Amino acid sequence: DGIVRGAYKIEELGDGSDKIRLLGSGPILRNVREAALELHRDYGISSEIWSVTSYGELRRKGLEHERSMRLNPEISEEPYVSRCFGDQIPTVATSDYISSVPEMIQRWIGGRYIVLGTDGFGRSDTREALRSFFEIDTNSIVVAAISALEQEGTLPPGTVEKELRNRNLNRERMDKTA
């Protein structure tokens, strides 16, 4: 049912109170799962891992629901996208499309929402190198999740800085969209 509706939960990793939701699709799901494993191993962070089959369908149904509610105010149920992502769990959406694709559902996300996408100029390289350049690789997903949790106060200040050093990532490098 979720496949057709636009998103479905693949798995939950861990059962702790510190939790992140990770969204991905297609080949990026491998990186999302790796990030979830690393977050659990290194920080004890639990993850919901979701496959998004269509941000467009989630948006269409969300907009359709909003229209229905305008015309029928007695409707009280939430749209599917809100039932999936409307709580306060911080969410990181990773896409090998431009970030405006996952941003289509931002209005229905309840908590902090970080989007990683391939904005910028076209390039030619290996898949691994391109994912690293566009910051949609496993390292970038882990850092985005840690950043969301640090901003929420779940992780102590300085956790992102430590993780950037551990992963040898340079925050001063050129912005991919520049």
What residue spans do the PLM features occupy?
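Thiamine diphosphate
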Residues: D1-A178
